[in-house]
Amino acid sequence: MKVGITFGGYCPMHQGHLDLIMRAKKENDICYVVVCGYDNEPRADEIGLTLNRRYSLIKQMFKNDEQIRVLKVNDTELGIDESMSESNWDIWLECVENQMNLEWGYVDYIFTWYVGEPDYVSALCNKRDNEITARPIINNVTYVGRSKNPISATMIRENPIKYWNKIAWPFRQYFSTNILITGTASEGKSTLTRDIATYFGIPYSEEYGRTYMEYYGKDDTDLTVTDFQQFLIEQRRDTQKKIESPGNCGIVISDTDNMVTLMYAQAYVEDPNIDLTEEDYKTLEQLAWNIKRGIQWDKIFLLPPKNKFVDDGCRYMVQSTMDERTKNYNKLVALLKKFGWWDKVEILDNDFLGNFNRVKEYVESKME
């Protein structure tokens, strides 16, 4: 039985890693992919790719591949640092060996390690050739250079859109540039979002609440806390689907998020025509906090109230006055600050063309 072994931090996994994995798989009967790293790694944690998350993504990626088995090694738990000392290698290799738990033992099994770094070749060969500290799971070491596919995790982290097609698909969502266009009603958010999406051919997320109300034939005065809970959950789900979709080439844009839902919920608590209470609002805000994790906005364009209110037959006209729209805008600003998004905000206070050109300019800067 021939066994291939690859290992790495995979932050993110990319085609360079897959070159190793696919070769190890094709040249052996089974292939082990060892995901390793530390707790509290700044480069990983800041983008949400903790060791456990990377391990989970890779397991999911290969769940239908009977040849590939995914292991995890937490270097922090092993008490080893990033140096390539003999003792560190001994501890690390023993952990890998124990996890393999090969029921057949090591008789008649050939273990080949596939690595993309020359230093790893030397270290593993030294362990194999040292009669005192040799490990039974090292027979051969194969170096797979990246001259034909020069890519690294560092290059991707520094410029993900440039190397988007090199990123393994499950990891792409963590490098997506997510843009939100927000504001009160009738300021041109939806039109601006669609126009930018059309111009660049990027996925966009629309206001779920509007679609929901049209489908069920509901007016604003029919809404209850249950409807608002549905808005919060499904809006997040729709945006996440766009971020994870194969159509995402690095940038996603949305014309609403849960801050807008909360803005309207606050306003409707004050409206005697709508059955929404302060306690209902507290429930909704807690739900919004709970589902905030996962979607990060890289840029938020905020449209202040200035345009003529357009009655499209679906809008709640009680909210149509400039005074009410200004109150709602102030609520939205307060929510953006409360939820920690204000540092991402840029106020768009130009005409329709000027606002389009500013967002277009921002998207183009991300594509350079």
Task: Report residues per predicted region.
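The conserved Walker
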Residues: 185
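Glycine-rich phosphate-binding loop used to anchor ATP phosphates in small-molecule kinases
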Residues: 230-295
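Conserved substrate/cofactor phosphate-moiety recognition/catalytic segment
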Residues: 198-238
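Nucleotidyltransferase catalytic core that binds NTPs
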Residues: 1-177
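Hydrophobic anchor at the beta1->P-loop junction of P-loop NTPases
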Residues: 181
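Conserved glycine(s) of the Walker
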Residues: 188
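A glycine- and Lys/Arg-enriched "phosphate-lid" helix/loop adjacent to the NTP-binding pocket
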Residues: 268-337, 346-354
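Hydrophobic positions on the alpha1 helix immediately C-terminal to the Walker A/P-loop
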Residues: 192, 196
